[in-house]
UniProtKB/Swiss-Prot annotation:
Lineage: Bacteria, Bacillati, Bacillota, Clostridia, Eubacteriales
Family to which this protein belongs: Belongs to the enolase family.
Gene3D superfamilies in UniProt: Enolase-like C-terminal domain, Enolase-like, N-terminal domain
Enzyme class: lyase
Protein name (Swiss-Prot/TrEMBL): Enolase
InterPro entries for this protein: Enolase, Enolase-like_C_sf, Enolase-like_N, Enolase_C, Enolase_CS, Enolase_N
CDD domains (UniProt xref): enolase
Cofactor(s), by name: Mg(2+)
Location(s), subcellular: Cytoplasm; Secreted; Cell surface
Bound cofactor: record note: Binds a second Mg(2+) ion via substrate during catalysis.
Catalytic activities: (2R)-2-phosphoglycerate = phosphoenolpyruvate + H2O
Length: 431
């Protein structure tokens, strides 16, 4: 017999995200008083192919960034259609909202409106069954805790400093479990603060909790991180690997070259590939995200041919959590991993479809936050539900980031002996 609990009410409100910008929060109540609440994140460096985040564009309110239109779309357009539907029928609810919107990129109702409802429905359903969200989405096989990909030095569009590359991250591949992984990362983070301080560099933190010092070169960021790893008593390569998010789309020029605007250096796509290969040869780098632009398919092919069997090549702007873009990438043999951001596509169903497609093609999936976050920790549950093996959700600083890590600690505790921490096995597709 199919279990049926109707959705009684859907309500949205405008709240603030971690950058002080408005975002959408949705509450779904199912019969019996089961409540699901979800809030929607927002990115600073966004891919051109992402689903549309609806903003009011009213300059007299929140400098044009209000989301009252999206909130109204939930309360007046989506709610009347979704109320009465089965809270367990996630696919049907998501499909109804996609059809209601009727555009390929959700620009009519807004991906921020649709996603808020989608996630809140899943949370209400989990609540009704008395399950953790990760168990509801992932079932009995949801047991893999992700290796954190922790952003501890920021540059690019995320920081007003001299560093062109957007994110330098640490990955505690030598940890035995998630709890230990988190401790190791926190210790490196605090040691990095000491290293930067000793060099007279800034220790103020950016949007994602990482430091944003003015460095002489981008490469120096890797060097100070490795110094901090050693100071914390760990071994680079064994205990920690480095991950980089280049956000190269931000550097891409109309003539097909790449401009490192903070240091006034221009590189061809071939030189970009050489640059990454050189860094990957010198340092214990395991992952490179958006090493070339979302538009540069030829550059992606060169990069994948050169480094695709050695390190993880993550498509973020390239794939935008979109199965059509991912399918094209798989057919062309570019990248070997996809970054998963729920708000790039706008529903839980489409997010899970993208992860499934990636896994079937032998691509890894990295569950990710956005630079504008809230206290909502849904992505922690999604990472475990899908056994994705990796999560990117900022430094161990700022509650909007730490909320996700703390939720993963709770999940690991709840899973007990069943919990698995993959370490280097997360990169099953590398030689």
């Amino acid at each position: 017999m199919k279990q049926y609990i109707p959705i009684e009410s859907v309500f949205a409100r405008e709240i603030l995200d971690s950058r002080g910008n408005p975002t959408v929060e949705v509450e779904v109540i199912a019969e019996g008083g089961f409540i699901g609440r979800a809030s929607v994140p927002s990115g600073a460096s966004t891919g051109a192919f992402e689903a549309v985040e609806l903003r009011d564009e009213n300059s007299g309110r929140y400098m044009g960034k209000g989301v009252e239109t999206a909130v109204d779309n939930v309360n007046n357009t989506i709610a009347p259609e979704v109320e009465g539907m089965n809270v367990f029928d996630q696919v049907a609810v998501d499909k109804l909202m996609i059809d209601l919107d009727g555009t390929p990129n959700k620009e009519r109702l807004g991906a921020n409106a649709i996603l808020g409802v989608s996630l809140a429905v899943a949370k209400a359903a989990a609540e009704a069954l008395g399950l953790g969200l990760y168990q509801y989405i992932g079932g009995v096989n949801a047991k893999t805790l992700p290796v954190p990909m922790m952003n501890i030095i920021n540059g690019g569009k995320h920081a007003d400093n001299s560093v062109n590359i957007q994110e330098f991250m640490i990955m505690p591949v030598g940890a035995e479990n998630f709890k230990e992984a988190l401790r190791m990362c926190a210790e490196v983070f605090h040691n990095l603060k000491k290293v930067l301080h000793s060099k007279g560099l800034s220790t103020a933190v950016g949007d994602e909790g990482g430091f944003a010092p003015n460095l002489e070169t981008d490469e120096q960021a890797i060097q100070v991180i490795l110094e901090a790893v050693e100071k914390a008593g760990y071994k680079p390569g064994n205990d920690f690997r480095i991950a980089i998010d280049a956000a190269a789309t931000e550097m891409y020029q109309e003539d097909g070259s790449y401009f490192f605007w903070k240091s006034n250096i221009r590189k061809s796509k071939e030189e970009m590939v050489d640059y990454w290969a050189d860094l990957a040869g010198k340092y214990p780098i395991i992952s490179l995200e958006d090493g070339v632009s979302e538009e540069d398919w030829e550059g992606w092919k060169l990069l994948t041919e050169r480094l695709g069997s050695k390190i993880q090549l993550v498509g973020d702007d390239l794939f935008v959590t979109n199965t059509k873009r991912l399918e094209k990438g798989i057919k062309q043999g570019v990248a070997n991993s996809i970054l998963i951001k729920v708000n790039q596509i706008g529903t839980l169903t489409e997010t899970l479809d993208a992860i499934q497609m990636a896994n079937r093609a032998g691509y890894t999936a990295v569950t990710s936050h956005r630079s504008g976050e809230t206290e909502d920790a849904t992505i922690a549950d999604i990472a475990v539900a899908t056994n994705s093996g990796q999560i990117k959700t900022g430094a161990p600083s700022r509650t909007d980031r730490v909320a996700k890590y703390n939720q993963l600690l709770r999940i690991e505790e709840e899973l007990g002996e069943v919990a698995e921490f993959p370490g280097l096995k997360a990169w099953y597709n590398l030689k």
